[in-house]
């Protein structure tokens, strides 16, 4: 085992996880001294699809059921456009001041610091990393639910659909955590391409299975009642439930597209030719278009199949029972997808902390030293003791939080509401205005500001709906006792 110390690195350009020395002329590096980026629009598209298409795609039938055919499909299309539009603005801000030849910004906070500065940098950090932490906890819960669904599906198949097949989530959360401890040793975002491509394939697979099962239900004629306005007050829901669930549904759709939290980190993996902003815009178009296609299919066909009684997730909530083996496979695909998605959202957190520690403690060998070891089938691998301890601790903590708060998805909705507006809409628009020097009160300025305020209202209403759902969950909460029934 060979040890080497990185304390001589230029910490303004090298972060933990980079296995090269900036001054080493024998290494293949970019103009900023970092390891040469090799990403393309295709790998960036895979990262985006992995980040965006979560198992929530299977809950869109429920969202459309709350809103109806007209509002549901319209909101899906509107937010797909808003997300793509603002992502192109953010892609142009990766370099500053010029989007092609300017200085690179490696994180979302760096971008905000370059264009806006002041307290907005801290606001961005709180929104971004709060969201990333929340997502990693939420994915731990969701993955365990999918794995539990596999066991329950087999139980229902063997004992009948009315059998008591209650299974605890906690062992599955522990297994998911162990897998993440291992994968978290992947040094940085640049090494995640294979994981994202695999996760993207999994997301296509389970979404396609869900769509296929919904089509089969519609073709069989056993469909639920649908309407232009969704669930009916006095029949399906009370007036209060209609309001709160509609708010929550709008928020779910809006947040389902959000990937601004990791956009800059994804763009930082792209090679410089063609220009990163051009490649990222192409990746965003492919990613958002693909996502919208699957969202509309899952949402609309799922609503057509189940009507106003559409379940929250028609795979894990057993909208379907047969064929059980296909449902097992789809739920396993969800779990595998979330294994990759967890890393896409966790890597920016890992690198943020490691970069800070390298800067603050450059002489601490525990933090700066790395060891070169030979790993079977993988070849030479650089291991940092600090990275091993810190990342393992993070995974353990998020897993324990997931076990303590199994209703955390309600909290995640609230976190999504709080972070969607600043990260996906406000900061990209404000930086675009600053970068292109749009005149105040011009037609374009007014249009951009109007979009900002409309999205702010959506976030506030969604937050209200999430709080109502959270209050309902807390009333029945029992720590370490909640089972997936």
Swiss-Prot record:
| Biological process according to GO | amino acid import; L-alanine transport; L-glutamate import across plasma membrane; response to nematode
Q: Name one GO cellular component term.
A: plasma membrane
Q: How does activity depend on pH?
A: Optimum pH is acidic.
Record flagged with keyword Oxidoreductase = no
Q: How does it sit in the membrane?
A: Multi-pass membrane protein
Disruption-associated phenotype: No effect on plant growth or seed germination, but reduced seed weight and total seed yield. Resistant to toxic concentrations of amino acids in the growth medium.
Q: What is this protein called?
A: Amino acid permease 1
